[in-house]
C-alpha cells in the first residue's frame, strides 16, 4: 500500500468517526488547526465528556479543501456542517 492510500484511509477514518459522533448526539465544541495537525473536540451535551479526534493538517486539508474552522463560539460551531 502506497503512502497516498494510507493517507486517504486515515482521512476517511477520522471523518467517519467525527460524523458518527455527531450523528449520535455529540456536538462540535471546538475545532482548530495546529502546526502539527488538526484537533477536533466534540462535546457531549448529556454528560459533559469531551472526545478529541486528530489528524495531520496536510492530510485533512487535502480532503476538505481547507474548510477547517476555528471558533470559540459554540452556537456558531454547532451550525457548521461543512464536512
Please annotate each region the language model reported.
Residues 1-83:
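Terminus-proximal functional modules
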Amino acid at each position: 500500500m502506497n503512502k497516498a492510500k494510507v493517507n486517504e484511509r486515515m482521512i476517511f477514518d477520522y471523518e467517519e468517526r467525527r460524523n458518527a459522533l455527531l450523528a449520535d448526539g455529540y456536538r462540535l465544541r471546538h475545532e482548530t488547526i495546529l502546526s502539527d495537525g488538526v484537533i477536533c473536540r466534540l462535546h457531549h451535551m448529556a454528560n459533559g465528556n469531551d472526545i478529541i479526534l486528530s489528524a495531520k493538517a496536510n492530510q485533512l486539508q487535502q480532503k476538505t479543501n481547507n474548510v477547517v474552522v476555528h471558533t470559540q463560539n459554540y452556537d456558531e460551531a454547532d451550525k457548521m456542517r461543512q464536512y
